[in-house]
Amino acid sequence: MRTISYIAVHCTASPQSWGVKELQKVFEQRGFLRPGYHYVITADGEVHPMQPEGLIRNGVKGFNKETINVAYVGGIDAKGKGIDNRTDAQKMSLRKLLSELHTRYPHAKIQGHRDFSPDTNHNGVVDPWERIKECPCFDAIPEYADL
């Protein structure tokens, strides 16, 4: 079993109406044989296991060996701009799944994909201007600090 240091929260940067089939098609179009997430949560709150936790996925460059990747479907508005548009069902399911994962991996840090960006000013915080990307379009660290 691999050592898990992180549980990364992602958004799919896709319409909220998408399901697993649409996501798999996009991954295939990008040249990936398998989805980059271990779990995906659709707008109705359903948790879809995509890959076994023991498999290394391509969710966060440089951290994949030690990360479980979880995504909610959505994260962009009609113009493609990043937005936290999680449904109430997604919020509830995401919290429950992250709690279960953190129970299995109690030393893992729960954070958003954007929080893996380098802290270029070394103040201990990834400031908005330091972020390589906005995913998951909300601040996951304080939201799940109680888990």
Language model features with spans:
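Ligand-binding face of N-terminal immunoglobulin V-set domains in extracellular IgSF glycoproteins
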Residues: V70
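Flexible, surface-exposed loop/gating regions in the mature catalytic domains
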Residues: I56-V60
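Short, conserved "active-site rim" segments that organize catalytic pockets and cofactor/ligand binding
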Residues: M1-L55, K133
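Basic/polar, cationic surfaces and motifs that engage anionic cell-wall
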Residues: M1-T12, E66, G75-L147
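Short, flexible loop/turn motifs enriched in small residues
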Residues: L33, F63-K65
